[in-house]
Amino acid sequence: MSRALLKFVRVSPTKARLIAREVQGMNAELALASLEFMPNKAAGIISKVIASAVANGDFEPEEVEITSCRVDKAAVMKRWRPRARGTASRIIKPTAHILVEVGPAKKDGEDA
């Protein structure tokens, strides 16, 4: 089993979790192929983290499956935007930590 962790990436954790749930449990090669055609910003980021996790374990993408793909909330950058009558509105720029773990793929008929 190998893992890759990307910290403080500038993407909303809630939006990235939608993509992470789609690829969890998939074969790594199939996940990378499907993420390539998703229009989301998070899809490209998660794709790179999956490729890094596969490379960290010296595996080939077709030999492994994604055992865990987790997106956690990180620090939030706060900015201010001037508004009418001297007031200000807060701009929230969320960041996320993305953790991907890959392990050997189970063969058909093989139990845990």
Curated annotation (Swiss-Prot):
Signal sequence region: none
Any single biological process term in GO: translation
Entries under Gene3D superfamilies matching the protein: Ribosomal protein L22/L17 (3.90.470.10)
Highest taxon in the source lineage: Bacteria
Disulfide pairings: none
CDD domains documented for this protein: Ribosomal_L22 (cd00336)
Protein family: Belongs to the universal ribosomal protein uL22 family.
Protein name: Large ribosomal subunit protein uL22
Source organism: Sulfurovum sp. (strain NBC37-1)
Organism classification: Bacteria, Pseudomonadati, Campylobacterota, Epsilonproteobacteria, Campylobacterales
